[in-house]
Design a protein with these regions (language model features):
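A short beta-strand motif characteristic of beta-propeller blades
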Residues: 58-63, 97-108, 141-148, 185-190, ...
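Intrinsic disorder/low-complexity segments enriched in polar/small residues
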Residues: 6-7, 31, 84, 94, ...
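Short loop/turn segments that connect beta-strands within beta-propeller blades
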Residues: 92-96, 136-140, 180-184, 224-228, ...
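Blade/loop signatures of beta-propeller domains
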Residues: 30-59
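Repeat-blade elements of multi-bladed beta-propeller folds
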Residues: 33-42, 66-88, 106-133, 146-177, ...
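Secretory targeting signatures
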Residues: 1-32, 308
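Detector for intrinsically disordered, low-structure N-terminal pre-sequences
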Residues: 14-16, 26, 97, 191, ...
């Protein structure tokens, strides 16, 4: 598969943090609010209750660590956790100094522009790659690893952690897996039509995930977290390339259209009915949710204008 290189050379090699407001006031980053997994939490709300820095003054820039394009950092317990293609690097949140560096087996046959984001929970760090791994957050030592039965590795979709469970994927193996957080034992697996590309979104007893196909329509699924039983599925005209964001009773997601505009979809979490659809530039963005509003980005270099949208939920 070919992928267009995403802009921003800095993101490919180093991590920069704007924290001047925290440092100047003496407030620790931990009390200001963590960001422990993709899009903040297992529901992918994507909006922090913390205040943003009041200026763009750079607090620190890490050394060249080979940071993965297309991956987000996780921030928890005073640490910044970074996917670096074949290494997971842990930085000190206040100084940017490397605390530890743990190697892992990256998927060799996929363009490295796409990378899964790590997740943190209860002193442990999780990452989906050729295998799904769990590390001790204190020193980076391996606690367990889970080899996907298909032999395939994750692409784009990282782990989601909730209620003692880790949800992970194997992309063109077409499966999502639910693992025990402490042992890595498989609890259940689910097969999707298309590639298992999303980071699963979890709200209460329900999980929303999707199947993506190049240039074709896709499908969104809702499962019970406890046992992986399907509750409903919804076919989409264009494929969902990103991940869903969940509110109390609604799932929001976007679609990517290679021939034109994509969409933002609002779907009932209860029964999978389409509540509304709004056309935007093609995107693999996961929506960010604040009360009453949805924020999404769209557009691709050379194909469509790039824009940020704010929609009424």
């Amino acid at each position: 598969m070919n992928a267009t290189k995403k802009p921003g050379a800095l993101a490919a090699w180093a991590v920069a943090v704007l924290m001047s407001a925290l440092i100047a006031t003496g407030v620790s980053a931990e009390t200001a609010g963590d960001w422990p997994q993709f899009h903040l939490d297992a529901a992918h709300r994507g909006a922090s209750d913390s205040g943003a820095p009041r200026s763009n003054e750079t607090a620190w820039i890490s050394q060249d660590i080979g940071a993965q394009e297309g991956s987000s950092v996780a921030i928890a317990d005073g640490k910044v956790l970074v996917n670096c293609v074949e290494n997971l690097v842990c930085l000190d949140q206040l100084s940017g100094e490397v605390l530890w560096n743990a190697s892992f087996e990256a998927r060799p046959d996929i363009c490295q522009v796409w990378g899964a984001s790590p997740a943190y929970s209860d002193g442990k760090v999780f990452l989906s790659a050729l295998k799904t791994i769990c590390l001790n957050a204190s020193d980076g030592k391996l606690l367990w690893s889970y080899a996907h039965p298909t032999g395939k590795g994750a692409v784009d979709g990282g782990p989601a952690v909730e209620d003692g469970r880790v949800l992970t994927s194997d992309w063109d193996g077409h499966h999502y897996y639910c693992l025990d957080e402490e042992t890595g034992n498989e609890l259940w697996r689910f097969t999707v039509q298309g590639n298992a590309q999303s980071t699963p979104a979890i709200s209460g007893s329900r999980v929303v995930l999707s199947g993506w196909e190049w240039g074709l329509g896709g499908r969104v699924y809702c499962l019970y977290l406890d046992n992986g039983t399907e509750i409903w599925n919804l076919s989409t005209e264009n494929s969902p390339c990103g991940s869903a964001a969940l509110s109390k009773d609604t799932a929001y997601l976007t679609t990517y259209n290679f021939e034109g505009d994509g969409d933002v979809l609002s779907v009932s979490l209860q029964n999978g009915s389409l509540l509304w659809k709004e056309s935007i530039a093609r995107t693999d963005c996961t929506p960010a949710l604040v009360p009453g509003r949805i924020h999404v980005c769209g557009g691709t270099d050379g194909y469509s204008d790039k824009a940020t949208y704010c929609l009424d939920a």
